[in-house]
Amino acid sequence: MAVRIDGSYGEGGGQILRTSIALSALLGRPVEIVNIRAKRANPGLQPQHLTGVKVAALLTDAEVKGAEKGSTRLYFEPKTLKCGNFSIDIGTAGSISLIVQTLAPILLYAPCPTQITVTGGTDVAWAPPIDYMRFVFTKVLERFGAKLSIELIRRGHYPRGGGRAVVRAEPVKRLKAVESEEFGNVVKISGISHAVNLPPHVAERQAKAAREELSKMGLDADIAIEVRNDGLGPGSGVVIWAVSDAGNVIGGDSLGERGKPAETVGKEAAQKLIAVLKTRASVDPHMADMAVLYMALAEGRSRISTSEETMHLKTNMYIIEQFLRVKFSTMEKAGRYTIEVEGVGYNR
């Protein structure tokens, strides 16, 4: 019997689709999602959502109904989980990072190592930048015992996309629980300030502004400058991440856009990082949204803390509870939110 998910629940966006498809593919359970993105100005499935569905279907030989642009209803019934080498093209500047969110849990439980080359947007609005996924997401997954890497080949910005990244994953038998309520002491802050098809001073000014903002808090940052001229269109951005002596990693990011000074871009990224550091939370809000799935799949009790209980986070926990016999608990304490769950110890 299919799990039935109301796509308009909570934040009512693409996150519901991504989590539902990932868990359906992983567990081999059919899912029917209705009212997909019903509250959005452009409701229904968009190209990047369709790409995630199609790749998940490719990896599982799934039977799919309703996978077309604008569709508000989708039926997904997976068969056999596959592995190997695959290439996909979103066909727009749709976010590669959001595709990775869908695929990562599936790839970790595939029967053999898998490599997927994804073409699309690496640094686009309303999605984590690719550098966040490379240097925060994958490092947090390591704490769960997962081996997943992301290699950046070329950057792609809105509206033309054309970015490319290679995702590689090693199969895991079981994920292990993570207990980390406090960030710990900062060991190092690193970052990348990039500019594509733009003057080098854009990346330099972004990095300088970020460093200056961090220095006000007594923090030093090693921010690399990356200037490229191989993009289909111009774009820039900054991602900064902090590593603690407890092994935690949190990030802050900002995207350049027409009319937005480079200094503002750098300052925003630093301020986001500082805001989380001040709470001493073990993960940032972006990562909390994603981490709860791995907590639920892991063996044993996991506990993390984050600086903000977002609607994305609440929605994701609800969707996970529809597929797995888990119950999340959240508690606000000392300016941060602690999330706890007893994982199912899933294995294939």
Curated annotation (Swiss-Prot):
Main location: cytoplasm
Pfam family, one: RTC_insert
Biological processes annotated in GO: RNA processing
Localization terms from the record: Cytoplasm
Reaction equation(s) it catalyzes: a 3'-end 3'-phospho-ribonucleotide-RNA + ATP = a 3'-end 2',3'-cyclophospho-ribonucleotide-RNA + AMP + diphosphate
Domain of life, source organism: Archaea
Listed EC numbers: 6.5.1.4
Gene Ontology molecular function terms on file: ATP binding; RNA-3'-phosphate cyclase activity
Active site: 312
Stretches assigned to coiled coil: none
Keywords from the UniProt entry: ATP-binding, Cytoplasm, Ligase, Nucleotide-binding
Listed GO CC annotations: cytoplasm
Binding residues annotated for ATP, in chain numbering: 101, 286-289
InterPro entries referenced in this protein's UniProt entry, alphabetically: RNA3'-term_phos_cycl_insert (IPR013791), RNA3'_phos_cyclase_dom (IPR023797), RNA3'_phos_cyclase_dom_sf (IPR037136), RNA3'_term_phos_cyc (IPR000228), RNA3'_term_phos_cyc_type_1 (IPR017770), RNA3'P_cycl/enolpyr_Trfase_a/b (IPR013792), RPTC_insert (IPR036553)
Protein family: Belongs to the RNA 3'-terminal cyclase family. Type 1 subfamily.
NCBIfam families per the UniProt record, alphabetical: RNA_3prim_cycl
Role noted for this protein: Catalyzes the conversion of 3'-phosphate to a 2',3'-cyclic phosphodiester at the end of RNA. The mechanism of action of the enzyme occurs in 3 steps: (A) adenylation of the enzyme by ATP; (B) transfer of adenylate to an RNA-N3'P to produce RNA-N3'PP5'A; (C) and attack of the adjacent 2'-hydroxyl on the 3'-phosphorus in the diester linkage to produce the cyclic end product. The biological role of this enzyme is unknown but it is likely to function in some aspects of cellular RNA processing.
Protein name: RNA 3'-terminal phosphate cyclase
